[in-house]
Amino acid sequence: MVGAKAFDFNDPRRTALSLLNNLLGGPGMNARLNIVLREHRGLVYTVESSLTAYSDTGVWCTYLGCDTKDIKRCLYLVRRELDRLCNQPLTETRLKAAKRQLKGQIGIACDNHENYALDTARYYLLKNHPYDIQAQYQAIDALTPQDLQQVAQQVFDKNRIFTLIYK
């Protein structure tokens, strides 16, 4: 597991980090870590990342399952992908596709009435207003490659990353 402290629920940078998280290890088969670790090299059984935001803090982490002999190589490849996001802004084409994918996933999640009710309750609790999917879409559409790179540099900084290895 590789992770870092992230933004709280009300931090506007959370939207950029959500998009970065989706790019890295989201549910799509096109997630960077899935392609690098699983599809190209066959090193992991599973790889996924998550972002959890609380009222006062947040956590971002990536989980991967691999053979013991592959741990160092996998950690190197994860670090390399994090460094790429920190050092190379996304192209406009890649950013547009990532935005479209995330908005589609949000829309599908809202079709689940239980998830939508939980999101609405969380928004009322933490923001004192209901969940507004259109506002979420606008926040995603407003993101620039520079926004994502800046957030990547803040969250994925080598000095802020923690690693937990289960053996």
What do these predicted regions represent?
Residues 1-31:
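His/Glu-based metal-binding/catalytic segments typifying zinc-dependent metallopeptidases
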Residues 1-7, 34, 38-87, 92-142, ...:
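M16 family metallopeptidases and their MPP-like homologs
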Residues 18, 148, 163:
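Short, conserved catalytic/metal-binding micro-motifs enriched in Asp/Glu and His
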Residues 144-153:
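Low-complexity, intrinsically disordered Gly/Pro/Thr-rich segments
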